[in-house]
A protein has these predicted regions:
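C-terminal motif of bacterial Sec signal peptides marking the signal peptidase cleavage site
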Residues: 16-20
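Conserved functional acidic sites
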Residues: 22-27, 32-260
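Bacterial N-terminal signal peptides that target proteins for export
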Residues: 1-9
Length: 260
């Protein structure tokens, strides 16, 4: 899965409430205050690592209304992605009015994620998501293609839950709490990502606006253990800011959002 706040001393900053105030500006964030954040109980059931986790396909829906990443068909997010060398890419994420039956029996919503550089497609991905009866947002796989000079180069990173041992994961819990740690995706040797929630009162300023009371995650991968990313999800919008805080300095910031 493709991932990418401004880092201060290698740490994202966070603060306090959940609305977007219009306007533009540079991407930034502020340090956890400690007040307002709740701690996850040890019994919270979420999938971790490569451990089996029972799911019932009949309890899933493609009508995704998780407050921290609602996916109504037609919704679109546009990001500016800047890498360590200063190269800028445009990322457009669109929720399609299409679904896919995943190999593990779950019907998933298809989300198109396209990265362009200098007007040329650099990466083209179809991600698959579904929501369970409790409101947890699940990630069930992706069909991704990287391009070089306008031609397909590799499909490395593609996977589907239920195929060749691949397992689905959580992208956003129904009731996110500080301390929750969960698997986002698992396909041994290809996609082994996880996340921990480190704040529920994060503040983010991006070109699209100012967001308070965001959920902030720390994202990691067993395949690239030196790379750590952090993300902020705003209520009613989804991801608004992503940055690599260790092993790189990539940054994604939300430029625009339109609800379907």
């Amino acid at each position: 899965m493709r991932k990418a706040i401004l880092a201060l001393a290698g740490t994202l900053l966070v603060s306090l409430t959940a609305a977007a105030c219009g306007g533009s500006g540079s991407a930034s964030a502020t340090q956890p205050t400690g007040g307002g954040a709740t701690t996850a109980p040890a019994t919270t059931p979420l999938p971790v690592d490569a451990k089996p986790f029972p799911i019932d396909p009949s309890e899933f829906t493609t009508e995704i209304d998780n407050p921290y990443w609602p996916m109504k068909p037609g919704s679109q997010w546009v990001f500016r992605e800047t890498d360590a060398e200063g190269s800028v890419s445009r990322v457009v994420v669109t929720v399609l009015d299409k679904t896919k039956m995943i190999a593990n029996g779950v019907e998933a919503r298809i989300v198109h994620d396209q990265v362009t550089q200098g007007g040329q497609v650099a990466e083209d991905t179809y991600d698959w998501y579904a929501q369970d009866a409790d409101g947890n947002l699940w990630y069930l796989g992706e069909d991704t293609t990287e391009y070089e000079n306008g031609k397909p180069k590799t499909k490395e990173g593609s996977w589907e839950a239920g195929v060749d041992g691949a397992l689905p994961g959580i992208i956003m819990p129904a009731s996110p709490q500080v301390g929750m740690t969960y698997r986002e995706e698992y396909y041994k040797g290809h996609a082994e990502d996880g996340a921990s929630i480190i704040s529920t009162d994060a503040l983010a300023k991006v070109p699209y606006g100012r967001f308070e009371n965001g959920v902030q995650t720390r994202n990691f991968s067993a395949i690239e253990p030196d790379v750590i990313e952090e993300k902020i999800y705003a209520q009613g919008v989804g991801v608004v800011l992503e940055i690599t805080v260790s092993g790189g300095s990539d940054r994604d910031e939300l430029l625009s959002y339109s609800e379907g």
